[in-house]
A protein has these predicted regions:
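GST-like domain detector, emphasizing the conserved glutathione-binding G-site
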Residues: 1-123
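Generic structural signal for helix capping and beta-alpha/helix-loop junctions
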Residues: 35, 186, 206-207
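Active-site-flanking alpha-helical
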Residues: 71, 165-166, 199
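GST-like fold's C-terminal all-alpha helical module
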Residues: 95-191
Length: 214
């Protein structure tokens, strides 16, 4: 299998997952939106987004689906398949709609738009993102106060998914330190090599720098 990726948040998540699982995949940097590249990638993913997992005669897109397939391929409980599976899916779903969504809202304004010249920062959207971040963090904080991971006693894909945008917090500036249980949980993730530096040894051009607004 081959994993097509970039350094953006969701492809990063897929690479971190594959490397954490030590999955039997090769990694290939891709740029579906590069001039002349669209038709090559459209047959693999009509959305022209990454990540994409490619096998013989098939392709699979979306980071969550890729995590499920890779986990099942090696028999890992990183993607739960027992009684914990509904709980894991609950946190994946809630995270994408609440916590990670809020992180993305702020990161898009302060990070993505400034990297790619997509316009000035919309401070109202930043403020709304912070409001939603605090609301979601107020739910997540007590959940993590008495345990190390979101599901059961071991790490799961729900932890990776919840933290999708936190590696980019140097640009977003979300106040993790206001929530000590979340901070400790994320520090545990950062102690995992595959999460902290998923691109080590891979050919993967750096993201454009975040440009400060004049």
């Amino acid at each position: 299998m081959k994993l097509l990726f970039s350094r953006n948040p969701n492809p990063r998540l897929a690479v971190a997952t594959a490397r954490y699982l030590k999955a039997d995949v090769t990694f290939e940097f891709a740029s579906p939106m590069a001039p002349g590249a669209a038709e090559t990638y459209r047959v693999l993913n009509p959305n022209l987004t990454l990540p994409i997992l490619v096998g013989e005669g098939w392709s699979l897109w979306e980071a969550d689906a890729i995590a499920c397939r890779l986990s099942r391929a090696i028999g890992s409980d990183f993607w739960r398949s027992d009684d914990d599976e509904p709980d894991m899916i609950r946190w994946i779903s809630w995270g994408k709609e609440r916590f990670a969504y809020a992180c993305d809202m702020v990161h898009f304004e302060r990070g993505t738009k400034q990297r790619y010249g997509l316009g000035s920062i919309d401070q109202k959207l930043v403020e709304e993102g912070f409001r939603q971040f605090h609301r979601a963090a107020a739910v997540l904080e007590p959940e993590l106060s008495g345990r190390e991971w979101l599901v059961g006693t071991a790490i799961s894909y729900a932890d990776f998914r919840m933290a999708t945008f936190l590696p980019f917090n140097d640009a977003a500036g979300l106040p993790l330190d206001d929530y000590p249980s979340i901070r400790r949980w994320y520090d545990r993730l950062e102690a995992i090599d595959a999460w902290r530096d998923p691109f080590r040894g891979l050919q993967a051009p750096q993201l454009p720098p975040v440009k400060a607004e004049a």
